[in-house]
Curated annotation (Swiss-Prot):
Catalytic activity: L-histidyl-[protein] + S-adenosyl-L-methionine = N(tele)-methyl-L-histidyl-[protein] + S-adenosyl-L-homocysteine + H(+)
InterPro entries per record: Rubisco_LSMT_subst-bd, Rubisco_LSMT_subst-bd_sf, SET_dom, SET_dom_sf, SETD3, SETD3_SET, SETD3_SETD6_MTase
Name of the molecule in the record: Actin-histidine N-methyltransferase
EC number(s) on file: 2.1.1.85
Natural source organism: Danio rerio (Zebrafish)
Keyword tags: Actin-binding, Cytoplasm, Methyltransferase, S-adenosyl-L-methionine, Transferase
Record text about domains: The SET domain specifically recognizes and binds actin, suggesting that it does not accommodate substrates diverging from actin.
Main location, first listed in the record: cytoplasm
Annotated compartments: Cytoplasm
An annotated GO BP: cell population proliferation
Limits of the SET domain: 94-314
Length: 596
């Protein structure tokens, strides 16, 4: 895929293997596993831990130099083979071709005019690499015994990909040969490039991603070399950190949830050819047709011959795109930053505020989001801030006053302020909080803009600085908006403007406008680093309205996530990383792996 696939294709690994004994390598692997499985560092020590883990990984990589084996040639040499295989499998092959789009990398180009909502691409199940196909492969015996593989389908897909790459008779070779040999995810950043992200909201996820990948690699290196059920895997002689990093990134940037053959549940899959499509703003136009057992994609808009065909990956922030897709999307209509807010349990009015929030379906403590759009806060955050700033009298009115239950419906509605004083307090709070968050960055926005003008800036540094700047611009927007709102409501108060009064008949107005939906009817997504994308979330705006089609988002469930396990001798080897819900609407807690 596009920007995610700016790569330097490597030649086959024919260099001499570094002189290292199996025992020496196993000792290094054990040291890495121990380091990555230790307790989380104390606050402020995460970077130090990252540097230490990275030093161990680099030591291992140096000793593994020349051991990785990849395909001779460059990616485009194999595109014709991919198309021929697709035709053989009865996938769609007409109306488009794979083409290079400069800064966006490879993508699909229309070879004829395509109308909006026209079905132009379908991929049958037989072409997909799935957790189910992994179970039926050489990886099956190990899968049946290993708790990590059973808990983490993404890891299963990564090892499945490596095993098939090493199998000269694999049916998926035409696909695997066209995958990038490197990616632009932070796993490929140099230490100094990662340093640009220090003090950003993204840094913790970046450091966790690296630590978890290193831990998984060390664990599976031991498993591959010691577990009886791994004896037939074609990885024993060549399973390097670079191999695993490549497989993780390939899966992280491409995996999707599709239904199993019987439709009873979902499974993870890599979808050849379709995953060449690059991202743009829009709507989900891909779904899985259970009746025909294939992935189907309709055109997002009208495309003229020669134009690039895009798909919509979902409502992801640029932090998600950078961390899990390896690119920064300049025109991201869904960009946002996280803001953690909560009512202090030591506050005198805590019980009353918590009760009002509970009635509105909002936790007393949660991670919300500030958006790049106008307004910068959603209905959920507005409701939280109103309750957060309520006086005891106002709280009592929403608990036991006239129409108290119905008034809960107005908390997220801009047309029904609690009071002018409440509005002034909440916007003052937001303005102050955003300003404080801005002070945590080590550079000013103008400094970032100046750095981006340097012609010798590396691609990864450019991506990191763009993300850092975008975070600040969203916070600056929140400060500006908060100030303007504060002044507006102060003027209303000073002029004695009448407060809009809620009447019971207004409930019809609230229920007939999506932007004014009662908070209690909207799902508040709590970002506790565990977002899972639901495949059955079709909106009325989605093109695939057929109930037999399940929407598909490219690269969803990005991280190699799973439940935390304690493999034999490994300690807490696998930590569950953040999962995101790219398809969620403007719900709080949206933040979550890159491209083609």
């Amino acid at each position: 895929m596009g920007k995610k696939s700016r790569v330097k294709t490597q030649k086959s690994g024919t260099g001499a293997t570094a002189a290292v004994s199996p025992k020496e390598m196993m000792n290094l692997i054990s040291e890495l596993l121990q380091k990555c499985s230790s307790a989380a560092p104390s606050p402020g020590k995460e970077w130090e831990e990252y540097v230490q883990i990275r030093a161990l990984v680099e030591k291992i990589r140096k000793k593994q130099k020349g051991m990785s084996v990849s395909f001779e040639g460059i990616r485009e040499d194999f595109f014709s083979e991919l198309m021929a295989w697709a035709a053989e499998c009865r996938a769609s092959c007409d109306g488009f071709e794979i083409s290079n789009f400069a800064d966006e990398g490879y993508g699909l180009k229309a070879t004829k005019d395509i109308k909006a909502e026209e079905l132009f691409l379908w991929i049958p199940r037989k072409m997909l690499m799935t957790v189910e196909s992994a179970k039926n492969s050489v990886l099956g015996p190990l899968y049946s015994q290993d708790r990590i593989l059973q808990a983490m389908g993404n890891v299963t897909l990564a090892l499945h990909l490596l095993c098939e790459r090493a199998n000269p008779s694999s049916p998926w070779l035409p696909y695997i040969k066209t995958l990038p040999s490197e990616y632009d995810t932070p796993l490929y950043f140099e230490e100094e490039e990662v340093r640009h992200l220090l003090a950003t909201q993204a840094i913790q996820d970046v450091l966790s991603q690296y630590k978890n990948t290193a831990r998984q690699y060390a664990y599976f290196y031991k498993v591959i070399h010691t577990h009886p059920n791994a004896s037939k895997l074609p990885l024993k002689d060549a399973f390097t950190f670079d191999d695993y990093r490549w497989a993780v990134s390939s899966v992280m940037t491409r995996q999707n949830q599709i239904p199993t053959a019987d439709g009873s549940r979902v499974t993870l899959a890599l979808i050849p050819l379709w995953d060449m499509c690059n991202h743009t703003n829009g709507l989900i136009t891909t779904g899985y047709n259970l009746e025909d057992d294939r992935c189907e994609c309709v055109a997002l808009k009208d495309y003229k011959e020669g134009e690039q065909i895009y798909i919509f990956y979902g409502t992801r922030s640029n932090a998600e795109f950078v961390i899990h897709n390896g690119f920064f999307f300049e025109d991201n209509a869904h960009d946002r930053v996280k803001i953690k807010l909560g009512v202090s349990k030591g506050e005198r009015l805590y019980a009353m505020k918590a009760e009002v929030l509970a009635r509105a379906g909002i936790p007393a403590s949660s991670i919300f989001a500030l958006h790049c759009s106008e307004p910068p806060i959603s209905a959920q955050l507005l409701a939280f801030l109103r309750v957060f700033c309520m006086t005891e009298e106002e709280l009592r009115d929403y608990l036991v006053g006239d129409h108290a239950i119905n008034k809960i419906f107005t908390l997220g509605n801009t047309e029904f302020p609690v009071s002018w004083e409440n509005e002034i307090k909440l916007w003052t709070f937001l303005e102050t909080r955003a300003a404080l968050l801005l002070k945590t960055y080590k550079t000013a926005s103008e400094e970032d803009r100046s750095m981006l003008e340097k012609p010798d800036l590396s691609l990864h540094s450019r991506i990191a600085i763009k993300l850092r700047l975008a975070e600040k611009e969203i916070l600056e927007h929140a400060v500006s908006c908060g100030r303007a709102k504060r002044l507006h409501f102060q003027k209303q108060l000073d002029e004695g403007a009448p407060l809009p009064l809620y009447e019971e008949s207004d409930i019809a107005l609230l229920e007939n406008a999506d932007a004014k939906l009662p908070i209690i009817l909207r799902k508040l997504e709590e970002e506790e680093e565990e977002h899972v994308e639901e495949m059955n979330q079709l909106t009325p705006d989605a093109v695939c309205m057929n109930s037999s089609k399940i929407p598909v988002l490219n690269g969803q469930c990005k991280d190699l996530n799973g439940t935390q396990e304690d493999p034999p001798g490994g300690g807490a080897v696998v930590k569950e990383i953040e999962k995101h819900d790219p398809s969620a609407k403007r719900t709080e807690g949206e933040p979550k792996d890159a491209g083609k």
